[in-house]
Amino acid sequence: MSFNDDDDGMLLNFTTDVSDASETVSRGKITGGKWKDRRKAKMMMEGRKPRVRGEKRPLESDGAPTFEELEASSSNSTSAQAPVEPKRSRFDNSSNVEQPARVTQPLQLNSQIVSSLFTSSRNIDTVTNSNAHDEKAEVTYSNAPLVGDTFDSFGITDTMVSHLNVKMKISKPTKIQKLVIPPFLQAQNDLFIHAQTGSGKTLAFLLPIFQSILSLGQNITRQSGCFALVVTPTRELANQIYQVTSELAQCCHFLVPCLLIGGERKKSEKARLRKGANFIIGTPGRVLDHLQNTKVIKEQLAPSLRYVVLDEGDKLMELGFEETLKEILNIIHGIDIDTHQFPKLPKRILHVLCSATVKGNVTKLGNVTLQNYKLISSGQKQTETTTVPDQLLQKIVIVPPKLRLVTLAGSLTTITQKHYKEGSKSDVTRTIVFLSCSDSVDFHYEVFSSHDGNHRGLVGDTARLLTKGNSILPCFNDTDDPNVICYKLHGSLSQQTRTATLKHFATNNDATKGKHLILFCTDVASRGLDLPHVSTVIEMDPPFAVEDHLHRIGRTARAGCEGESLLFLLPGEEEGYMDYIKPYHPKGWKLLTYDEQVLRPAFEGLNVRRTDKKKEDWDKHEAQAWDNNATTWHLNVERRVIEDSHFKELAVKGYMSHIRAYATHLSIEKKFFNLKCLHLGHLAKSFALRERPKSMGLQQGKAGAAAAASQKKPKEDSKSKMLRMAKMAMRQSNDEFNFA
């Protein structure tokens, strides 16, 4: 088509495409009918097939691979792989063939991958042990009772000495008790008591207080007033000191202790305070609460308070109780003390601070609370590093993240087998497994206590006895009785449950006779608790501070007894943690290999039954290779995660909480515990999870959105709304003060 412009003589030519015009006409707008019909007709005109509702896109498979598929993939691992096409240069124009666009598939929430336990692990750099334990060296029991000394030589009365020998089975003092009791009785200075864990610090400050009260020669009752206030960082430690005080008070029944801790009814505590108490033991928050709001407690303190003891001072500061302690001391110092009623007692309040360490914040607390104090240390100078007991055998195993769970199973199995061989039918073996968070405790407790339903509850749901037929630990057959009790303990449990669980774990009775007791717990059980006959402490998650490491392993090898401790570390940066804790282990440690020294002894010579197979198809006499047994055991736990939604929720919560807890290590230790260096997928394997970490995050977000949506009120239908509006109009019309 041409156009001639007569004004300027220009000739314009326009070229049009006939096919485009026809296509435009053919793709006219469709009118009439429903929008769905119009949409369907338009897609048919464009040559697209309408998608049927409910039809899924052909993406990845949502189902988990079966065990047979895993075995097939592992057996064909040596087969030749498909050749990989070399990458083309972005400047290569040799081919003009149009390449298909790259489609990025969306992340699937339920996609799962079964990975092998023993492949694709990070190399372990530590080959030789730089701090090897000398097994031939002579062991000196650093916190054992002294043979050549007695309590009566320190000025303790015969009544108290006899009670210690007969009722409490304590005949000899420890080194720290020998150093503390004489200056405590003189009451000339405040005291800073520094000693190893398990050396007897509790009796070191309780015995002089009892001796001072018994030496008064006056008629003492519970109404005579409170002589001592003991403040501890945790409820469990406060409860333990209360039990020791009550046991000591049996030789002088007129002395009454009182326990003030969170989680208990304040009304009951106030009633006990009104009746009178000679010893008050409690946690900082609850003690301050009563000092501020309970009038009778100040009346109890005025005539008799002479001793204020702060136990585990480093933990008090670590938990942020500095301001609370200052308020407690300000209130106490503001009370006018009557020295005429008990003239033989000290003329002022004697402050005592106990701690296993003498550096950092605890020194600051000592400067705040103590005046003209005397440092008493069990043979160690203040500048020296606190060391572990000499009779403690420390072991360290470097475990790839995928193998953490099965290695823990192997360790617990080995300890149980040792209990069967070396212990008698009445001996009790106790093992404590420390984990980083309460959700991880719940998961591991569920793994080892209720895998196949063969268990019986003892203390609510926090203690379970494994019964005959249990295949998870430590026997893998249907004929042997496991003789294992599993416990869990963490701060999220109620105080009554925590107390009952700890009491059951620490008591030797018919229920625990001849059994292996396993306690899964957080650091709530790492401070000051004197649990009898703890043979092994397992630190599956490294502590958040080196002081916590000392207190954790201090639950064993107490009062001259032998003990073992096992620390789990990951390959890579965490291996440097060994050099960091080396000064605290002058006797060295044993470096174990996870495969040959942990897994092989536990799983060799067995035939672990697969849970997806019938018992009739299982030949228990046909032994399998140890690595096959370990893999089967772990896959059994993974199948349970798939089949049990509640157990899967515990696994996901445990994994996510473990990641968050891992990021809270002290800044000085970040070079060993760096979150960026973790392989999150392999770590998820240790929680028996097959999902990718991103999928778990999306699942949690989707679950939270669903929970929020379920809380929304249902939409009101038109009929209900009309009736509601009519009733509202009637009420307004009947109101005589309606001016609308």
Curated annotation (Swiss-Prot):
Position of motif Q motif? 149-178
Which residues fall in a compositionally biased region of kind Low complexity? 697-711
For this record, the Gene Ontology CC terms, alphabetical, are: nucleolus
BP-aspect Gene Ontology terms: rRNA processing
Helicase ATP-binding domain: residues covered: 182-376
Looking at the record, the residues that make up the Helicase C-terminal domain are 414-607
The compartments listed are:
Nucleus, Nucleolus
Pfam hit, one: Helicase_C
Could you say which EC number(s) this protein's record lists?
3.6.4.13
- GO function term, MF aspect, one: RNA binding
Q: What is this protein called?
A: ATP-dependent RNA helicase DBP7
* Organism, scientific name: Kluyveromyces lactis (strain ATCC 8585 / CBS 2359 / DSM 70799 / NBRC 1267 / NRRL Y-1140 / WM37)
